[in-house]
């Protein structure tokens, strides 16, 4: 049996920015001139109910996989194209050969009603203060951003957790010790791959109540987020500081059928071997 739980909240937070992007159909991860992280949430209550009512009697047979579609073109000629940035008036290019980590969000957060990542030369006319209908038309600082999970509350550290904190947890995750925060990692070869992550252990802990479900955050690994720290970054990456490297994913606000979801599979396979008999042996 296969069940889909569609993601119900998305938001991209940008380092040092109070802008909210909860209604944008594209969520972009950046490193280089800017740093961003992606927050998302899914409701596990439907699967929990099916466990409680006996539809899924054995949780060990459940497998949960996160699926989020890459917004990048499959046209390889576009992979090297530099584009106008979503943040400020700089440039961006497709990131390639990188890892993305996934960690648990520790607090309730609101997706907000913002759209744009920042004011740029392309959208500045929307914010003409002389026209009351355009003022702050697509910009909002309410709800989730780099500094807060929702109005009136603060993250444990800016950006949920600092890059330094994630770096320490990433070392634990990569060792036998394990991390209590980071739950997964996915490598991207070209940069246009979709997210496909096994989150079975965490999802089952949401069902059992061992963990509270506040959602998951995706980020570049700490060495990429430290791109401006020349001591922490090798010389081969020095050119990355002059523009943003990005990868984009379709959110639940996409107007396509590529909505992000968690796929739950229950292995209820029963083997019928009644046609197989062995002489001189009890056959059950």
Where are the regions that the model predicts?
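Secreted, disulfide-rich extracellular signaling modules
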Residues: 1-284
């Amino acid at each position: 049996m296969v069940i889909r739980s569609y993601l119900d909240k998305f938001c991209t937070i940008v380092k040092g920015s109070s802008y909210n992007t909860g209604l944008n159909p594209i969520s972009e991860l950046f490193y280089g001139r800017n740093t961003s992280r992606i927050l998302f949430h899914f409701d596990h209550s439907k699967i929990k109910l099916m466990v409680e009512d006996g539809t899924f009697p054995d949780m060990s047979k459940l497998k949960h996989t996160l699926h989020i579609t890459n917004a990048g073109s499959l046209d390889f000629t576009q992979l090297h194209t530099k584009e106008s940035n979503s943040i400020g008036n700089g440039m961006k290019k497709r990131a390639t050969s990188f890892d993305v980590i996934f960690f648990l969000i520790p607090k309730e957060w609101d997706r907000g009603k913002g759209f744009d990542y920042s004011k740029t030369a392309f959208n500045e006319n929307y914010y003409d203060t002389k026209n009351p209908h355009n003022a702050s038309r697509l910009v909002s600082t309410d709800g989730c951003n780099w500094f807060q999970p929702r109005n009136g509350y603060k993250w444990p550290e800016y950006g949920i957790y600092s890059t330094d904190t994630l770096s320490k947890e990433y070392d634990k995750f990569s060792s036998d010790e394990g991390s209590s925060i980071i739950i997964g990692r996915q490598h991207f070869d070209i940069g246009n791959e979709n997210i496909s992550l096994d989150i079975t252990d965490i999802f089952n802990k949401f069902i059992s109540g061992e963990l509270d479900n506040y959602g998951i955050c995706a980020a570049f690994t700490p060495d990429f987020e430290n791109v401006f720290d020349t001591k922490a970054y090798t010389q081969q990456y020095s050119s990355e500081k002059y523009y943003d490297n990005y990868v984009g994913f379709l959110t639940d606000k996409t107007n396509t059928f590529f909505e992000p979801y968690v796929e739950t599979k229950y292995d209820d396979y029963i083997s019928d071997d009644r046609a197989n008999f062995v002489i001189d042996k009890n056959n059950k």
